[in-house]
Regions:
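Short beta-strand elements that form the blades of beta-propeller/WD-repeat-like
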Residues: 13-32, 57-71, 75-77, 103-115
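Repeated scaffold domains used in trafficking and secretory/extracellular systems
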Residues: 2-20, 47-64, 91-103
Length: 133
C-alpha cells in the first residue's frame, strides 16, 4: 500500500539515511522509513495537517544527519530517531527545493508565484524559523 494514492503527485524520491539506519521513501503525502536489508516498513510520517495536506516534494540530509522533508508548502525536520524536530509551515505555495546547508542555515528555493516565481528562503536549521526571504 506504499503507493496507492500517488495520483496527482509525480514526486517520488528515496534516500539512504545512514544516521537513522533506514531508507526514506517519499511520495504522495508521506515518507515511509524502510529497513535497508529487507525493505520492511519500520514507520511512516504523514505530511500536512488534519484539515488538509501538504504533498511530498523532495528529501535532503543536513550536516548533522537531520532529514529534511520538503513538501509543496512545508518543511519538516526529522531527527535520526525518526521523531519530528520541527515543522516550518507556509514556506511556499507550490514547491520547495533544497540548495544547501550553510552552517546553521538551510538555503532553499520556494515557489511563491507559479509558474516559475521562485524566491530564495533561509531557515534556521535548529528551529525552522525563517531567517530571510
Amino acid at each position: 500500500d506504499i503507493g496507492e494514492d500517488r495520483v496527482g503527485n509525480p514526486f517520488c524520491e528515496a534516500i539512504h539515511w545512514p544516521a537513522a539506519g533506514v531508507v526514506a521513501l517519499g511520495l504522495a503525502q508521506r515518507v515511509v522509513f524502510l529497513a535497508p536489508a529487507t525493505g520492511a516498513e519500520l514507520s511512516r510520517l504523514t505530511l500536512g495537517t488534519i484539515d488538509g495536506g501538504d504533498f511530498f516534494g523532495h528529501l535532503a540530509i543536513g550536516d548533522d544527519g537531520t532529514l529534511y522533508v520538503l513538501g509543496w508548502c512545508d518543511v519538516i525536520a526529522v531527527a535520526p530517531s525518526r521523531k519530528v524536530r520541527w515543522i516550518a509551515r507556509g514556506v511556499a505555495i507550490d514547491g520547495i527545493v533544497w540548495c544547501e546547508q550553510r552552517g546553521p542555515h538551510l538555503l532553499l528555493e520556494a515557489e511563491m508565484d507559479p509558474p516559475g516565481g521562485w524566491v530564495p528562503v533561509v531557515l534556521d536549521a535548529a528551529t525552522g524559523r525563517h531567517v530571510e526571504r
